[in-house]
Structure formats: structure tokens, C-alpha cells
Amino acid sequence: MPPTATAEPVTASTHMLSNETDYHALNAMLNLYDADGKIQFDKDVLAARQFFLQHVNQNTVFFHNQDEKLDYLIRENYYEREVLDQYSRNFVKSLLDRAYAKKFRFSTFLGAFKYYTSYTLKTFDGKRYLERLEDRVCMVALTLAAGDTGLAEKLVDEIIDGRFQPATPTFLNSGKKQRGEPVSCFLLRIEDNMESIGRSVNSALQLSKRGGGVALLLSNIREHGAPIKNIEHQSSGVIPIMKLLEDAFSYANQLGARQGAGAVYLHAHHPDIYRFLDTKRENADEKIRIKTLSLGVIIPDITFELAKRNEDMYLFSSYDVERVYEVPFADISVTEKYYEMLDDARIRKTKIKAREFFQKLAELQFESGYPYVMFEDTVNRANPIEGKITHSNLCSEILQVSTPSLFNDDLSYAKVGKDISCNLGSLNIAKTMDSPDFAQTVEVAIRALTAVSDQTHIKSVPSIEQGNNDSHAIGLGQMNLHGYLSREGIFYGSEEGVDFTNIYFYTVLFHVLLASNSIAIERGTFFKGFERSKYASGEFFDKYIEQTWEPKTDKVRQLFAEAAIRIPTQNDWKRLKELVVAHGIYNQNLQAVPPTGSISYINHSTSSIHPIVSKVEIRKEGKIGRVYYPAPYMTNDNLQYYQDAYEIGYQKIIDTYAAATQHVDQGLSLTLFFKDTATTRDVNKAQIYAWRKGIKTLYYIRLRQMALEGTEVEGCVSCTL
């Protein structure tokens, strides 16, 4: 295997330097060339080492042995006794020995810093550390394995070897007595009645209190000026509900730790769409301005078709549509019913220009990075599950079917619908390609995420509980694509890069379905509604059985051969189809590619499957200030492969995501990056290109001069290489 980015030699002179230089100063040297004009990767290795010597070791509580430590952590209510009671003490100690025998070392200073500031168990006063990474990994494994010793051992191997990384809420909370939920992303529908609105605000409070980010659907709310009790011009539209939600998230701020996070989605053909977008304008009136809620817009195919022909675009009264069709506005296919609704005199309409709509969208994205975009028809064509997908989540990668709830006057449930929770974790593509057993790595990840679903019980929001219990939905993500491609001498977005992405996701999909089918066979059950899905009919498998999927380039064929990873054949898919049709799959949804933030640094990965934003990334980390992070596997000899996202451009990013999208049942967080010379026309071109390529959702729009959240993207030395 090629050397990692941290394999640069540490010389005697750097050892002398380390005795008198603190870890923060050493890390900062990443942003300075050495005398030969090289990036000083060795200084970051030293910084990580010094972080332990100067800080971690001095602030870690000492125990004489494992028994003393475990007894203390249980007795003092740090660890959940119920988790450990599922195993013998000897097994728990053997698992810890297994983890420590791996001799794990953080590859970067930022990875170590992130772990100790954000994840590890600390004393109740927050001043001292009670765990090392090995302890955290074992507690995650013991929690998720729920008494299965074999699975616990496999989980320790997969996590500590860096192949599988649970998402933040799972990695942070598992096994702790004082903890949040292991899942932290939720989607709710709001229906067009006061009971649903009130209950949704309460649900947002409950979920935010538990550390959750919540996305809510506003498309069904009657528009501004619609009738209430047959009296015209009474409705206030969606803006006051957005204000209520913004205040709710601000109030439920997780014990003051951080602001609650919320997003709202509205359909492009809802009459309030311009009002909705105007809430994010910098010069918006304070009465309507929305500062902290994220915005998403749902755009159907018809909107693009109208813009292509430079035609008018009609917005339809959501109030009238629900009365004519007897289903909520969001459950109607606007593309399918557009001309029918246009001709229906019972439905009020507002006329705008389709191209003007896209222009306003691009202007706002330039100004604020919002809104997210969901391509409604693309999403629903690819959906193998019965029902309609109406909106996405805070990171635009969760795409699941939801159903409305009905409420009594006292806000109790007359009928509990299905809302959505996201159980996430990601594979490190580079480490997974290096796995001694690719199929096992994928299966263990699926079993871990299924355990998160099985162990999550959000009883305060019955529709979330119902959705989780019925669907067992999970979202296996991926990260470190750019890092892996660069390590192997492939440019991101090149023919070989896109070819690898296609075959990798194709192969993962096969093993994901096989794992979920195995769980269904073991448990003798499958997700609710399986029999009405494209999995049960076999239709889902047609594209894999009717054509051959194999590498188009010699390089990618060679990578899979050297890794001894067998690429599934048409016959493999035929056998899998027979198994699934006969026995089902346990999980309604299986894959979703989130943006991956902090866990990427701990795992030393490039974020998600998008390109790096900088060769050496600058982050602002609380009181410590600027911290520098080198791209994985980068050395002074392979810098040419580390073009940043702004240099690569939107087409290659979209091509890469399109290759992955065709094998992912949910979505992928796709941020578009533009140089500061870009215009709104460039943004519109990118949106059209994404739509044509079958992309499902778009996340943020980033201009080079805009800072990524929590970072500074500026002209640092390493960016100019």
C-alpha cells in the first residue's frame, strides 16, 4: 500500500524542536514551507504526539487495571450498567485488550484534538478524560452488538482499523449513562391544520432537546391570503410557522451546548415560494427574516421544462389543491397534474416567469448558500418503496417515504403516521478497499446501523417511533473518495475517477442488500410494506440483471483485482433477486451519503465523496483558534492529485455524484463549489446539469470567498501549490 500522509520521517532535529514547541505551534507549521519549499507534514505528526505528552496524558484519570476502571465508571454513573451486563467481565476485558493491541495512533493533530474535545468521556466537571479512543470504540461495539460477542469483536476491528465510522450521535453517546440518542436527524410533515402545526412545534422542541436536527415540510400549509373557515384572505401562510420553529430551535439548545438545528422545505409551485425565499435575504425586513433555519426547495421536472421553453410558471393554491384532490398538496405530482390543475377553475393560480424563478434561486444561493434543492421527480422515480418522498433533511441526503398523522382537538393522535429518523454511519473508501474481507466490512456496518435503529425509541414523538419501527431504515454513507483516488494516482472527476466511483458503489450495493436479506432471514421478518416494493416485485434488480456492470478502465479493473474484491456478475444479481423476493430485506432504506464533518477528521478521511476544499484546510476550533488539517495520503510527491473543489469545477463533481447516485436508494449531500468569478448564470447551468445527470438533491452553494461553516477558506500557503 502507498504510504499515508503521515509517514514522513521524524528527524532528530524535529525531536529537539518538539521538546520546546507546543502542539499548537507545531500544527501551525503545516501552513509554512520548510527551507526546501516543502509542506512540513512531519510537524503535524509531532503535534499529535505532543498533544498527548503535553495535554492528554496529564489530564487523563489513572486506573491501576481494567477492573478498577470499569467498576468506577459503572459505580459513578459514567457507563450504562445495562450495556456491560450483557457480557461477562472477562469478555469485556478481552475486547479492550483486542482494541489496545491494535496500537492505534491518530494520523493528525486535528483528529486527536477533535476526538478529545468532542467525543471522549470526561469527568462531570469536564476537566479530565476517562477514556481513550480504544475505550470509546469498545463501548460503541458492546452497545450495538447487544450481547453478541462475535459481532462486538468484528465491530471493534472495523471501527478501530478505520473501515467503518459510526455517525457522531452513535459514536458520542453509546454506552454512556448520561447520554443523548444514538440518532440525531429527523424529518417531520406538517399538515394544513392547527393541531398538526402545534404538534410539530412540540415535536421540534422534543427532538432538538435530544440533540436532533429536524427538517419539516411546509408544502401542505395553505398559502398567504387563503381562506380560513371559508372567509377569504385570512391565512398568514408559511412565514409565521417558520418564525415559531426558529424560536423553538433557539430555545431547545441542548443545555446551552449549541443552537438547535432546523430546516424547512417548500415546493417550488407553492404560492408562498417567493416570500419563503425572501426570508433569507440580507436586506429582508426583520418581521420576516429567518436567520437560523435552513431552507430547502422542492423542484419538479415541469419547472425545468417551463424554463427551457421560457414559459410562465404557475403556482397553485395548496388550499384548493387539497380540496379538489382530497390529498395534501405535497402528495400530488405537480409534473403529472400541472396542466390538469391549470385548466381547473376551482384551483387559484399565481403566474410568475419560470426563468425568473431560477434567477431568484441563484441570487439567493450566491447571497446565503441556501436553499437546498430536491429534484422531486428524479427522487421519486428512483424510489423503490410504495408512497411519495416529499422532502429531505438538514443535510439533503435522507430521502424516505412519510405519511401524515391525524390529530384530535387535544393534540393526541387519532392516527399515527410515519415520520423519519436517520441512522447513519460511513465507510472509509480507502480502508474498505484495503479490507481483508470487503463483504464482511459492509455486512458489519449494516448490522451496526440496524442495531442503532433497533435501539432507538423516541417515544415523545410517536410518528418518529412508528416510522422507525416499521421501516428499520438506515443510511450507510461513504467518505474519503478524494483521498483514495489521490493515493492511487487518479484525478478526481477523471474518467478513471468516475469509473471507480460507479463500480465501488455498485459493489457496495450488492453487499448491502445481501446483508439486509441475511438479517431478514435470521429474524423471519422484513420491513413493513416490503411486499408492495420494487424489491418484492423484482423490478429493482432489472437494471443489474439486464446489463453488465464492469470497469471501463484498466486502472479500476486492476484496483479491484489487487484488492481481491470480486465485482458482482449478472448471475450474482439473479441469485440475490431470488433470495430477496423469497425472504425480503429487513431495512426499508439502506444507503445515504451524508456530508461527514468531525468524524472525517477522526477517521483521517476526505469529507464524504466530494473533493477537498484545500490541500491544507484551516479550521477555527473554539478557544484554541486556527487548526490546520492536511488532506489524507498527501505527500510532497503527489500534490498534483489534490486539486481543490473550486479548481475541479461543478461538472466533474456532478459526474462523480451521478455515478454513485444510481446505486444509492436515498440521497447524497452534494455541495457545489464556484470560484469568485462565477455568476448566477453559472449556478443555473450547474443546477440544470445536475438535474439532467440524475442528481437527486443539492446541498450548499459555496463561493471561494465564502467560508465553509467552522472554517476559513483563505489563500494559505499550501493552497497555492
Curated annotation (Swiss-Prot):
One Gene Ontology MF term: ribonucleoside-diphosphate reductase activity, thioredoxin disulfide as acceptor
Active site: N393 (proton acceptor), C395 (cysteine radical intermediate), E397 (proton acceptor)
Cellular component, GO annotation: ribonucleoside-diphosphate reductase complex
Protein origin, superkingdom: Bacteria
Feature type site, description Interacts with thioredoxin/glutaredoxin: C716, C719
Class of enzymatic activity (EC top level): oxidoreductase
InterPro entries per the UniProt record, alphabetical: NrdE_NrdA_C (IPR013346), RNR_1b_NrdE (IPR026459), RNR_lg_C (IPR000788), RNR_lsu_N (IPR013509), RNR_N (IPR013554), RNR_R1-su_N (IPR008926), Rrm1 (IPR039718)
Transferase listed as a keyword: no
Subunit organization: Tetramer of two alpha and two beta subunits.
Protein name, UniProt field: Ribonucleoside-diphosphate reductase subunit alpha
Organism: Mycobacterium leprae (strain TN)
